[in-house]
Design a protein with these regions (language model features):
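Binuclear metal-dependent hydrolase catalytic cores
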Residues: 1-173, 181-185
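A conserved mid-protein helix/loop that constitutes part of the nucleotide-sugar donor-binding site
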Residues: 178
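A short alpha/beta connector and helix-capping loop motif
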Residues: 181-198
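Short, small-residue-enriched loops and turns at beta-alpha junctions
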Residues: 201-203
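Charged helix-capping and loop-helix junction motifs
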Residues: 206-213
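Conserved small/polar residues in nucleotide/adenosyl-binding loops
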Residues: 219-224
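N-terminal low-complexity segments that are often proline-rich with Ser/Thr-Pro
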Residues: 226-228
Length: 228
């Protein structure tokens, strides 16, 4: 089961101030968009990708009672600033929540959210860090219970981000403008692909709509190798 929790921009839709709804129709309820995040679930396992500033309301809305793992695509605020909201999952069963991400993002998280991962002399005596960092490489494969996850490398302008493929069927590629050559083969033959489509016109850090649409057509079709 795939549940899309949010598909909004970094400031959400509507945005504060004069940005407002932008070109979106405020009369269409689907245009009210929270920050990007997705749940992957089956009967035994619940995996969250990204935890932005809307994550508490997103998880409450979908009645999420446990998390087996959290995967973080990159260190931008709209993908990580809700990590503190995950503490109650630890309070319930006293098992640290595993946060999977790359080395660059891990380093950033330890700087910004050190108290969530490491106990310090200044911490309250009763406060135990509820999260545990798990470093993953690009193109690594692992299993969370009965769900298989493969990570791929994506370009997001001045930084690289993680994309994820679940059970060789579902690809989640947010905040990407281009893929390196060795990411392409991993994406073929998907049943479902969710990919950034920020604007109608090209953008330096996000794929625009036509590029995203063509990616979906390409990667949810058989690989050229399979078609001879």
């Amino acid at each position: 089961k795939i549940t899309v929790l949010g598909t909004g921009t970094s400031v959400g839709i509507p945005a504060l101030g004069k940005l407002g709804w932008g070109n979106c129709d405020p009369l269409n309820p689907k245009n009210r968009r929270q920050r990007c995040s997705v749940l992957i679930q089956n009967e035994n396992t619940t995996i969250l990708v990204d935890a932005g500033p809307d994550i508490k309301n997103q998880l409450i809305e979908h009645n999420v009672k446990k998390l087996d793992a959290v995967f973080i695509t990159h260190q931008h605020s709209d993908h990580i600033s809700g990590l503190d909201e995950l503490r109650p999952f630890y309070f319930y069963n006293r098992e640290k929540i595993k946060i999977y991400t790359n080395a660059e993002t891990s380093e950033f998280l330890l700087t910004r959210f050190n108290y969530l991962f490491e106990k310090s002399a200044s911490s309250q005596s009763y406060f135990n860090p509820p999260l545990e960092l798990k470093h993953i490489e690009y193109f690594e494969e692992l299993n969370i219970n009965d769900i298989n996850i493969k990570s791929i490398k994506q370009n997001h302008g001045v930084i690289d981000t993680l994309g994820f493929i679940f059970n060789d069927k579902f690809g989640y590629c947010t905040d990407v403008v281009d893929f390196p050559d060795n990411s392409f083969n991993s994406l073929y033959n998907l049943k479902v692909l969710i990919i950034t489509g920020l604007r109608e016109n090209p953008h330096s850090a996000h794929a625009h709509f036509d590029l995203s649409f063509n990616c979906c057509l390409l990667y949810t079709s058989p690989s050229p190798r399979d078609s001879g």
